[in-house]
Amino acid sequence: MYWSWCQDYYSFVLSPFHDIITGHNEPFWRSLRLTDTLAEGGKELGIKNLTTLHTNRSNMLEKNLAGSSSAKPFMTGSSCSYADIFLYTCVRTVQETGGFGILRDEFGGDPFKDCPTIASICSEVGSINEVGQTVGSKFSECPI
């Protein structure tokens, strides 16, 4: 379930936002996606719709994790999985990279501020020595 959520979030939220951020407004680029975020009303409506989708998706995951007795400190218990790392990557991309300031602006800050369980899991993943050494400041230095 958790890997699926991350894949869904990446495909339907992050990837279409990336098109907006990079200015890939040509139909060629948008046709490569599973959905065409800009087809129904341009950039502003696309951002509004993707913001709503982000909220719905993150609230669904937060509710599922908060109601799970096994989601501590990681999504499925005491061991960090690939899904935890994928979640960490998705969340930190939104929270720290320059381009996703578009989404942060829609929330007046952190788009995951109402998701304490997701935040806790990401903190745990980030505290893993190998993750911290590998990631360093890459998210905050990334322009997109």
Describe each model-derived feature in a short phrase.
Residues 3-123:
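GST-like fold's C-terminal all-alpha helical module
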Residues 124-144:
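C-terminal helix/juxtamembrane-tail motif
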